[in-house]
Amino acid sequence: MVKAIKVMLIPNNVQKTKMFQYAGASRFAYNWALAREIENYEKGGKFISDAELRKEFTKLRHSDEYAWLLNISNNVTKQAIKDACTAYKNFFKGLQKFPRFKSKKRSMPKFYQDNVKIQFSNTHVKFEGFSSSRKANKQKMNWVRLAEHGRIPTDVKYMNPRISFDGLNWWISVCVEFPDCKETLNDDGVGIDLGIKDLAVCSDAVKYKNINKSQKVKKLEKQKRRLQRSISRSYEKNKKGESYCKTNNVIKKEKLLLKRNHRLTNIRKNYLNQTISEIVNRKPRFICIEDLNVSGMMKNRHLSKAVQEQGFFWFRKQLEYKCSDKGIQLIVADRFYPSSKLCSCCGNIKKDLKLSDRVYRCACGNMIDRDFQASINLKTYGEKFAS
C-alpha cells in the first residue's frame, strides 16, 4: 500500500534562500510552458509534448538572459513543465478548469525533487543540487534537518517528493510503499451522522463534540477577529488614492494573523484525525456515512461558517484513507436517503421534520435524539450493502 508522509523541515538561512530559488525557478518554468502552449494553440498548432518543451527550455537555460537557471537542478524545471502540460491536457479532457499562471505573491512556493537522487537519514534529508561540489555533498551541513526524526523510512523507494512553503514553515511530502497489513475486523458495523451541533454521532451511542465550541478555539477566533480589524484600520489609514501603503507594522500583524489561522487549522485537523482514528481503531466490519450536499449547505448564510469550520470534506477524505488502510468497507448512503426523518422502529417517514426539532417523536411512541436515530438508520442502510 502506498502512503503519503508529510514532515516539517528546519532549514538554516542559506538553505531557505536556496529553497526559494528552486520554488521561483519551478514557477517560472510552469508559466513559460503554459504560455508556450497557449501561444501555440492561438496560432492553430497542435499540442506540444512536454519532451519537446523541455528541449526548448534547455536551450533557454544556456542563453545569457536566463543563465541564472543553470544554478537550479534540471529536474525541478523539468517536472514543472510536465505539470503544466498535464494541467493543460486535463482541461481539454474536461477533468479540470483552465490552468492559471502562478503568481509570485499568491501561489504557494513549491518544487519537485528527483525520487532517485533524494536521500533520507533518520534526522535529515539531502536535496539534489544543494551542494556546490562532491566533497561538500558529503558534509552534514548541506543536509536539511527534519522536525520529526525517523518518520520517513530510509532505504526504500520514494515517489513524487514535493517541497512546499505554507507561509510559515517548509514541508516535504513523499509517497512510500508499505506492505499490506490485514486486520481482524469485528462482525458489527457503525453508522455515523455528521452534523453542526456535534461533529459525529455514532450508532453505538458514542458522540464526538464540536471542537469549534471549545474555549480554546473561541479564544483564538476572538484574537483573529481583533487582528483582522486592526489590519483593516491600518489599510484605511495608509490609503493613498487607489493603492495601499503596506507598513512594517501591517506586515507584522499579517504574520500574526497567519499564525492564528495556522493554529486554528491545525487544531481542527488534529481533532478530526483523532476522531477518525478512534472510530477506525474499533475495527468495525463496515462504516456507513451520508453523502452530504456540502455546497448546498454553504449557500445558507446562517450555517455556512459553521459548515466550513466543521470540515466535512476533510473528514470524509481521511475516513476513506484510513478505512482502506485497515481493510474496512466504507459505504456512502444516497444523498436523498431520509436518515433523520425515518423512524428506526416502525419505518415511518416524518416529512415535516424541521432542523430545529432536535428530538424525533413518532406516532408509534418512539422518542429519540434525531442525530442518534440518523446514525442507527445509516447503520441499517449499511447492513444491506455490506459485503
What are the roles of these predicted feature ranges?
Residues 1-387:
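Nucleic-acid substrate recognition interfaces
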